From Swiss-Prot:
Top-rank lineage group of the source organism: Eukaryota
PROSITE patterns assigned to the protein according to its UniProt record, in alphabetical order: ELMO (PS51335)
InterPro entries according to UniProt: ELMO_dom (IPR006816), ELMO_domain-containing (IPR050868)
Chain segments annotated as coiled-coil in the UniProt record: 1-72
Comp. bias intervals (Low complexity): 156-171, 245-275, 574-592, 602-618
Protein name: ELMO domain-containing protein C
Domain ELMO: 382-545
Region of interest (Disordered), ranges: 153-175, 245-276, 574-618
GO BP annotations, alphabetical order: actin filament organization; cell motility
Amino acid sequence: MERYRIRRERKEILKNEIEKQRDLIQKEDFRLMSNENNEHNDEHDNRLIELNKQLNILKLELEELRLQGDRFYVLNGDDTILMDIDETSKITFYLCRHFTDLTKIPIEESNESRILIVNELETVSDPSIEPIFEFQKVISSKSIHQLFSVKTNFDNNNNNNNNSNNNNNGNKPSLFERVKQNTWSLGISPLRRTTSDPTIFGERFSPPKSISNFIERFKDNKEKDKEKDNSSLSITIQNNNTATTTTTTTTTTTTTTTTTTTTTTTTTTPTSSTTVNTNINQEKLRKYSTTPSINQINNQQNIENNNNNNNNNQEIGGKILLTWSNKETSMYILKTQEESLELLELLGSHIDRSKKVTAKQSQTIKILFQKKSTIYESTNPDHEEYLKHLWSLLYPEQEFQKKSPLWKKFGFQSDDPTRDFRGMGIMGLLNLIHLVQHHNDWVQEILAQDRDYPFAVAGINISNLIFEVFQISEDSLQQPWYSSFWSSSYMAMLCSMSRHNDHAFEELYFLIFNLLDHLWIQMNATYMMFPLVIKKLKSQLNEISNFNPNSFDEVRARFDLIQRLNIIDNPIDQQQQQLQQQQQSLPLPSSPRSFLNNYQQTTTSSTSISPSKNTQNN
């Protein structure tokens, strides 16, 4: 599409500008190194600073373009696959097939599919040209954060041969050749991509703080290079002397090896036998298709291999290997190495952003856990300010009171709300403040409907529920960033929400509270059924997280979808009803203990409430 074309053109321009900028920086570095008298060092330093600023601006723009997504046509076996990467870091894989007649497209396969005209511009300019339709059927959809590693050109024989030749000649393979073996892996280091050659990170491309040491090392390397040149020159002279005695044999061998045989291959576009149109113009398909078949690429590579006899710099196809966190691997063939490297960099940009978001969110969660562990103290002025803030949001026209029946009306267990904060600390209070401040209309609507559960205590239990299902504890927060804790589906969902929202935890709290109220209505729940509603809520949360939503809007859409489906079975069967009748009245928990455990045992703590709202109000 047009936006992809414009984006790619801009990326190519930026790549060229970045290379030019790096050349300027390197030249400025050498000028500084060659200045043995240390004259005008400040001028050189300022110049380097300015050049690096300009380089960072270019790199930032290129990074932003890559984060907007792109699409790549690749080959997997005999199938043509479209990898569509969007701005939310989701990869959608489409199986592509081509038709010149819409009636040939199978209707039974049209679910989760789309049709595009690949030669639309040509048909507009020349109406005599028949349109070619590309049928794209969804194969799978995955989030980029599920990738474990990405590797490109992992079995490039030409590079291996070049490297071995360079090693035999005593020359180290060039940096370009080694970077072409570029590899990126989650398990190596956060927030950066690496290459398969770790020695690259030992090289410097700008002077260190100690310029004198760098110059000394630079001089030593130049002397070593001269020695290598002299040794290679003597080897070349010896080889020339021996070569003159074998001219006839070499000529005969060359004549023999340059004789080639011609083979013909048939270009086919992968389609099923029921949809093949024998009247399709194969020449048009080859001309307009953006996804050549395997045979086309093999044909092209054969031509390139023949041309490589005259030109060793001929471009060859690119390959990329994706390894997912579940150890599933898949290999794809692209048209060029440049395209595979661009795909590698694009995936790396999305993963870098994901790791940065995870690192930021991990710090936020640690702060939230500290607040959860902070016990509410009436003598602490900051804690009292929090309580005053909640009162002003609920009853702005009334003077603040530490103890009041209005607290019980809001859903606390008594006139003193501070007794309910013992389980979740000030975290439970802060979540209620955010809820009332940013979703006040919803709160007032629920309170007006007089639900059969105490609102404030239910909110405190939801705060505990989030920490429970996320498995947030003091031990889990000490785990490294690449552990299963930080890569869990729940944590990935929270991180995707926080990419464009600074209050992701609080907004997730609201979505869960809203879903709780919805389940309460759908299950026609009573006060005694609160633990069963919580159990159903956990099941729904697990289902939502397994969808791997990649943005705040997608998470919210998943919650809305659960509510709109209205397919919720009544969880109370006859046996459970009989069990309920035998149970004594159970309090609604306000401490961060398991809801189901509280359901099975009666608590007699001071935080317990009466078994029904009628007795509360009396």
